[in-house]
Amino acid sequence: MTDRPPTLADFKAPYPEPGPDQTCCIILLEEKPDEEENYRVELIPGRVMEDGLATGTVSGVVREEVIHGWGYSYYVVEMEPLVTTRRSIRSFHRPTRFVPVPTKHFIRYNSQLPVVVYLPHNTELRYRVWTPIDMQKVEPTEPEGLLKIEERAG
C-alpha cells in the first residue's frame, strides 16, 4: 500500500478529467459507526487573498453533475470574477486569509464513494462535516397565541 493521494483512476469509475483551467480535489470520508444519512458535508470553495490590501468578496456556485450510466455524483465549482474595494495599507507584511463563497452547499455523507470536486486553479476547497444532535420536538402554537393582521379597505 502506498501513501500517495488517490487519483480518479483508483475508483474505477469514468470521472471526467479536469479541464485545462481546473484542478480536481478528492475527499475520502471516514465510515461512521451510526447512520450516515444523518450527516452532511458542506463544501466551502473560496480564494486565499491578501488581508488588509483590499476588502474582497468572492461569489460562485457549486453545481452537481452525475456520471451517466453510473449514478455517481461529482461537483463543479464555478467562480465569478473577484470584486474588491481597495484600502490603503502601510505595512509591508500582508497576511493572507481564506475568503469563502457565501453560499452553503450541503451534500449527502457517503463513505463508500469519494467526493470529487472540480474547481478553478485559483480556488481552494475546504469542507466541514455536520453531525447530528438530538432531535427537538416543536409544539404547535395555539391560534390565540398568534398575532392577527388586520386588513384595511383602501
Swiss-Prot record:
Which parts form a coiled-coil structure per UniProt?
none
Give the matching InterPro entries: Ecotin_C, Ecotin_sf, Prot_inh_ecotin
The Gene Ontology terms for molecular function here are: serine-type endopeptidase inhibitor activity
GO cellular component terms listed in the entry, alphabetical order: paraflagellar rod
Q: What biological-process GO terms show up in the record?
A: symbiont-mediated suppression of host complement activation
Domain of life of the organism encoding this protein: Eukaryota
Q: Which family does it belong to?
A: Belongs to the protease inhibitor I11 (ecotin) family.
Q: What is this protein called?
A: Ecotin-like protein 2
Organism, as annotated:
Trypanosoma brucei brucei (strain 927/4 GUTat10.1)
Q: What is the lineage of its organism?
A: Eukaryota, Discoba, Euglenozoa, Kinetoplastea, Metakinetoplastina
